[in-house]
Amino acid sequence: MIVVIGIFYLYPVIDVFRLSFTNATLIGDNPVYTLSTISNTLRSPQLPDILWATVIFVGGSVIGQQILGLAVAVVVVRGEKRGLFGTTILRTTALVAWVVPGIAGGIIWQMLFSEAPYGALNSILRLMHLPVVAWLSDPAIAPWSALIANIWRGTAFSMVVMYAALKSIDPSLYEAADVDGATGSQQFFFITIPQLRAAMLVNMILITIMTLNTFDAIITLTGGGPGRATEVISLYVFNIVFRNYDLSGGSVLSVLMLIISLGLAFVYASFLPKEEQQ
């Protein structure tokens, strides 16, 4: 089993590291080992803007998915306890977004954000006698449009994680709080949130890594434009390798993504409660 894991997971990572020290391309032969690719790629004038777009996209997605996922999970759990109608429908509706492929999700949101005469959101704005919005062509608005689409897609995953964590909380904690006269908001902030700390941090690690690697929905929705307003690092890697045929440059950026992912994972993990604190 270890050998199989090594072949299918470890070897590609090692090979990406190796390629980052070469001048390999998709159409060239006999690459030579050099450090110039690393320096040229990291000194690219486009890289700072792309990293900033990535920070906005990943940071906004993590915060939005965490908050909305927790909100939906709380509503579902409380609805189940009270036997409210529509709880199952809400849970199923949230999960639908998760199973929709990224390309399909991008197309759906492209139709919603379309600036054509019959674009869904702009049609609603016209009915309300409000000015239409350049959802995808304005460099200041397009990143937020991509962010909304990604939050919609990823909220379901956070909801599943938070739902499982909420169901595992000992009900006696709430019973004791009721006896002590704690309000609903006090129970939420002093019982629910502390009990969810580990689940929230693990969820943040997972959705950060998933969002950092997201490019399918963006390439369908905006193609990285207008300009480079929505070109995150994962899409930049795709463009470098498959449009510029620069395999070594893409490898350097892939290693950079790996370092960022591991760094953020270690930061999140450092806040996980120790066993004696649980």
Place the predicted regions along the sequence by residue.
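A structural signal for multi-pass alpha-helical bundles of membrane permease subunits
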Residues: 1-278
